[in-house]
Regions:
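Bacterial N-terminal signal peptides that target proteins for export
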Residues: 1-10
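Short aromatic-glycine motifs in intrinsically disordered, low-complexity regions
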Residues: 75-81, 128-135
């Protein structure tokens, strides 16, 4: 008879501790994985200010023979010819239910800015980032992996 209350208590504690371990915010350092090659491309730090998320490139993973900090030659406006490391590539994202949307993402490879939405997966260990034109169906997604 006493086993039942102990089992219920143990199950309750297990659920509570597993919920504590889940991360519901994308704030932190993320490894951007190239969707074509599957190799790491960059480290991006996502921060929050006044309820909006932004992401800045902290490091590029480049071959030794490549320029280690190339400039964004295809970017327009203020980002034109700025070093890619240090560039804000994600901005204006706001919480939208369990997802994040309403912001933009810059692709330094082509200099284009896209609408963006994001969602956390695998208890906050992965971030699904989608950049698109017009509607989300017309875009591409990448999965970023949490570094810290």
């Amino acid at each position: 008879m006493k086993k039942r209350p102990i089992s219920i208590l143990a199950a309750g504690l297990l659920i509570a501790f597993s919920a504590i371990g889940q991360t519901s915010s994308p704030v932190g350092l993320w490894k951007n994985i190239d969707d074509a090659t599957g190799k790491p491309k960059a480290l991006i730090r996502i921060t929050e200010s006044n309820g909006e998320l932004s992401g800045k490139i902290e490091k590029l993973f480049r071959e030794p023979s490549e320029e280690q900090n190339p400039k964004c030659v295809k970017c327009e406006g203020d980002n034109k010819d700025k070093p890619i490391v240090g560039l804000t590539m994600l901005q204006g994202m706001k919480k939208d239910g369990t997802d994040f949307s309403g912001g933009t993402i810059l692709d330094p490879a082509n200099g284009k800015v896209y609408k963006s939405k994001m969602s956390l997966e695998e208890d906050g260990k992965k971030l699904n980032v989608r950049g698109y034109i017009g509607v989300p169906m017309l875009g591409r997604s990448q999965t970023w992996v949490r570094e810290e």
